[in-house]
Amino acid sequence: MKNIKNIKFLFAFCLLPIFACADYLDKQPDDMLTIDDIFSSRPRSQSYLSSIYSFIPDEMEMQNNYNMLGICDEGDFIWAASWAKQINIGNWNTRSGYYDKWAQFYKGIRSATVFINRIDGNDDPTLSPDVRACWKQEAKALRAIYYFYLIRQYGPIVLMPETELDINLSNDELQFPRSSFEDCVSFVIRQFDEVLQSPDMPETYINDNDKGRIDKRTVMAFKARMQMLAASPFWN
């Protein structure tokens, strides 16, 4: 009987740390920012905007990205692991996944949409209205650029809602139809035109720290590429 009491006492004693730590475990770690945290601070919002650029492909990278010389007559790839080499030797099918950027570009589109819909709510006093408006146009241009890449690679694509989607939506609620090629091109051109007509987007940047950011010259270049693609006989 005494042993049973001792076991019960020991069991109850072992449970104390579990209940004592319950409140501690419920706390959110300091290094895990919420979306509201990001869009209540100028530096965090700027970092988020910079992260949207990360989905832009490096079209000069020879191994895994967009350089097509290796599967054309202009050259050949000797790297066995290269997807271009695998295509040349016929080692591919519809499920190979070579050159597949579908998910990458839609991640960029979603990130840009989140930024566009939330940046106006950033009331950090160090973030001026002019800078906020410029960033918003920058994100809009990035979103249109990712749509351009998708259209160039896949033809008619899914044009996502311009509002932020709830991540808890069911699979059925996330089934959006593909738009026609003409509608896709018109949407991208319209997005580029809105950025070009906006006084908030600079023609170019003077500050060295801003070099590499999208300006109106960048947007005009991508608009021209979109129009050339749409005019190509391959799409008519």
Identify the residue ranges that each predicted region occupies.
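Membrane-proximal, proline-rich intrinsically disordered regions
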Residues: 21-67
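Short coil/turn linking the two alpha-helices of tandem helical-hairpin repeats
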Residues: 151-152, 158, 229-235
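Bacterial Sec-dependent N-terminal signal peptides
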Residues: 1-30
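Short, conserved phosphate-binding/catalytic loop or strand-edge motifs used
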Residues: 162-168
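Conserved, well-structured interaction surfaces
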Residues: 41-58, 80-154, 173-186, 190-211
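Aromatic-lined, polymer-binding surfaces characteristic
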Residues: 156, 165, 182, 209-221
